[in-house]
Amino acid sequence: GGKFFLIQIASLLLYQSNNLIIAHVSGNTDVAVYNIAYKYAGIFQMIFSLIIAPIWVAARDAYIHDDISWIRGIMKKLNIIWIFFVLGSLLQLMLSQFAYDLWIGKSLNVSFYITALCFVYFILNMKAGIYNNIINGTGKVKLQFIMYFIQVVIHIPFAILLGKIWGIEGVLVS
């Protein structure tokens, strides 16, 4: 329970630190640009998260009953579903400027590059979500706990450094 709590705190630090860092290195307007691209790119992840959410409990049951073949099978199916989400995300990325024009008009300029970086983040995050749900289901969260801790320790200084060099894009690359 305590490790799950600390993982959630680390997630919060990872996800929310970008807003503060972008505001510091690039300005509040870029925070708005980042948030628009982030929200737009995150649409498919929201849907994907709904699909994989029940896997946590199912993986727990399979693990308790030593049904490793079920776990392997569901991972294979989820990876195939993930490919379709990647393709959908790429289509959504190609339509991003049109969507921004409808959504926010010409009030802000959200570059294709910033949007693409957000999509890369969410595509990788969806992939990691498959494995995180399986790991959580087995109750073996030590590796996930260590990885989140390392991510926080590395991400924040690199986001500040790269943000000072490349602006919002540097924060996203970090």
Question: What kind of region is each of these model predictions?
Answer:
Residues G1-V57, Y121, N125-G129:
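Transmembrane helical elements of multi-pass membrane transporters/channels
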Residues Q45-D66, R72, N132-G137:
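Helix-loop junctions and terminal segments of transmembrane helices
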Residues L12, K39-G42, K77, S89, ...:
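Residue-level recognition of pore/gate-forming positions within transmembrane alpha-helices
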